[in-house]
């Protein structure tokens, strides 16, 4: 799982190529891009460069992407690229976009990709409706950029939920304050509640500036066992 590149601000092509090289040594079956890979400061050439580079990750079953709250330039009136240009580039690079839809990977695994809750131009589906009819004997993984609605996912029968967004606080004392304000269901790390495995990554880069005083930058390798 890779999340929160915010490409062009805190990570450049050479650094991203090194990340791709390291991930390729892990021989992943599936690659999850969990949102905010680009943002309002990412130029059109940088956006194209980011996804083209990420498409070089070797995999068995594909690369899957969900939007974060920044990818579509939600916070600027003068974007460098449009949501249409973004989607076209991602698709051209062989990456599958999941936005409130389901992708069956094989006989054992299903991905449920969520629309970001901060996207005012997209009415987000109810997780129960979205997963209606899914075979509960299969293992299904929910991809949701922002760590939210975990209780609803658990009730619906989710096995794993993967999120980013928080940067684990990035700068002290944000990581201490945000859990107290209940801004997200989980700020960072791994928690198991009932049958639901919850994972929130700190992200592979920072937002706004290349500084961290909370947690480390990371990509996450997840080993999944059959039910």
Question: What is the predicted function of each stretch?
Answer:
Residues 1-227:
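Soluble catalytic domains of enzymes that build or remodel membrane lipids, polysaccharides, and related
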């Amino acid at each position: 799982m890779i999340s929160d590149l915010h490409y062009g601000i805190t990570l450049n092509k050479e650094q991203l190529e090194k990340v791709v090289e390291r991930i390729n040594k892990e021989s992943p079956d599936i690659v999850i891009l969990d949102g905010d890979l680009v943002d309002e400061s990412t130029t059109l050439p940088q956006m194209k460069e980011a996804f083209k580079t990420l498409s070089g990750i070797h995999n068995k079953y594909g690369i899957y992407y969900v939007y974060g709250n920044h990818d579509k330039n939600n916070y600027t009136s003068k974007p460098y690229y449009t949501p249409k240009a973004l989607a076209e580039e991602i698709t051209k690079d062989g990456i599958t976009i999941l936005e409130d839809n389901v992708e069956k990977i094989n006989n054992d695994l299903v991905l449920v990709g969520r629309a970001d809750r901060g996207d005012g131009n997209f009415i987000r589906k109810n997780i129960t409706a979205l997963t209606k009819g899914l075979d509960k004997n299969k293992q299904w993984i929910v991809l949701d950029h922002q760590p939210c609605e975990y209780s609803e996912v658990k009730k619906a029968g989710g096995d794993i939920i993967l999120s980013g967004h928080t940067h684990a606080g990035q700068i002290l004392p944000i990581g201490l304050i945000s859990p107290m304000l209940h801004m997200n269901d989980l700020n960072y790390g791994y928690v198991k509640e009932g049958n639901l495995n919850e994972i929130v990554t700190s992200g592979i880069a920072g937002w706004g500036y290349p500084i961290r005083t909370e947690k480390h930058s990371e990509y996450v390798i997840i080993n999944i066992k059959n039910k």
